[in-house]
C-alpha cells in the first residue's frame, strides 16, 4: 500500500496529516511518499530530514504545479499494489480508516474508493460527487452537519457513485495503470472526476465509503482561483470535461435521480 501526498511548504499542515496517520492507522503494511513540489521554505526541507524513515520517503517533482502529473510521477515511485491519493491538508479521524479503504478496494469489482470528508467545523466537505451539479460535477451534502445522514441516509451509506474526490481516494494500482493514470491536461480541477469516469468505462465500480472519515483543510497549499490565469485555466478544464464527457453530462449521472435538482447539493427535488 502506497500513500501519495503532494506537498509544497506548509510543514505544519503536513505534520498534522502525518501524525494523524501514525496515530490512527491500525494497518501497518504501508509506505508514505511525499511528492515535493518546489518548496521555498528552509524549514520544509529540515522537516523532510526529520521524518524520513523506513515508511516515509520524499521524491522531488521540479516542474510547475500540475496535480495530475505530480501524482502520476509519485505513482511510478510507489511499491504498493494499492495507491492512496491523499492531500497534505488532511487529518485522519477514524482509527480503522486504512483497513476500511483497503477492504473495500480489494473487492474484485471495485476500482476506486473515496471517503467522507469534513471541514474543521464538522460540516461535510465531501460525501460523493454527482456529475452535472454546478455545471460539470460537484460534491453533495456540502455544509451539512456531521452526524446528519441526509436524503434517504445517502451520506451515511456505502454506495456506488460515478465519482469521488482524490483528496482521499484509494485505487488498485493495476486499475490506475489500466486507465493511464490521471489526465495531465487537467492540472487542478476535475482530474479526479475524469479519472473515476474512465475507471467506470473499464467496468470497475467507484465506491463512496462513509465509514472512512477525515478532516479536510481545503486548498491550503493550492489557494483559490483568484487570478486571471487561474480563471482561464479553470475555464479550460470545464471545456475539457464538457467535450470529453458530453454523453453523461447530457443524459445525466446514472447514480442520481433525474427528478432531483442539479442546482443544489442536498438531493432537493427539481423545480421547473
Where are these regions (language model features)?
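C-terminal, non-catalytic tails of nucleotide-sugar-dependent glycosyltransferases
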Residues: 1, 111, 121, 133-160, ...
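A conserved hydrophobic helix/loop-capping motif in glycosyltransferases and polysaccharide synthases
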Residues: 2-13, 17, 23-25, 34-37, ...
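Glycine-rich, basic loop-to-helix element that forms the pyrophosphate-binding segment
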Residues: 61-78, 96
Amino acid at each position: 500500500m502506497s500513500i501519495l501526498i503532494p506537498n509544497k511548504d506548509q510543514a505544519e499542515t503536513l505534520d498534522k496529516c502525518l501524525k494523524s496517520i501514525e496515530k490512527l492507522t491500525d494497518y501497518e503494511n504501508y509506505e508514505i511518499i511525499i511528492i515535493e513540489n518546489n518548496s521555498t521554505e528552509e524549514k520544509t526541507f529540515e522537516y523532510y530530514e526529520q521524518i524520513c524513515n523506513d515508511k516515509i520517503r520524499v521524491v522531488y517533482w521540479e516542474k510547475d504545479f500540475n496535480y495530475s502529473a505530480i501524482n502520476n510521477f509519485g505513482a511510478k515511485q510507489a511499491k504498493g499494489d494499492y495507491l492512496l491519493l491523499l492531500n497534505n491538508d488532511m487529518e485522519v479521524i477514524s482509527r480503522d480508516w486504512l483497513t476500511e479503504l483497503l477492504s473495500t478496494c480489494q473487492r474484485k469489482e471495485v476500482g476506486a474508493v473515496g471517503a467522507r470528508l469534513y471541514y474543521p467545523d464538522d460540516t461535510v466537505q465531501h460525501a460523493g460527487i454527482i456529475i452535472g451539479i454546478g455545471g460539470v460535477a460537484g460534491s453533495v451534502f456540502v455544509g451539512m452537519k456531521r452526524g446528519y445522514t441526509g436524503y434517504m441516509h445517502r451520506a451515511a451509506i456505502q454506495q456506488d457513485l460515478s465519482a469521488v474526490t482524490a483528496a482521499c481516494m484509494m485505487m488498485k494500482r493495476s486499475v490506475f495503470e489500466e486507465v493511464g493514470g490521471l489526465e495531465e491536461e487537467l492540472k487542478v480541477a476535475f482530474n479526479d472526476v475524469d479519472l473515476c469516469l474512465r475507471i467506470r468505462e473499464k467496468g470497475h465500480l467507484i465506491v463512496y465509503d462513509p465509514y472512512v472519515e477525515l478532516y479536510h483543510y481545503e486548498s491550503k497549499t493550492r489557494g483559490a482561483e483568484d487570478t486571471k490565469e487561474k480563471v482561464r485555466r479553470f475555464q479550460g478544464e470545464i471545456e475539457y470535461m464538457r467535450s470529453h464527457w458530453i454523453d453523461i453530462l447530457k443524459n445525466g449521472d446514472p447514480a442520481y435521480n433525474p427528478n432531483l435538482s442539479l442546482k443544489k447539493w442536498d438531493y432537493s427535488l427539481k423545480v421547473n
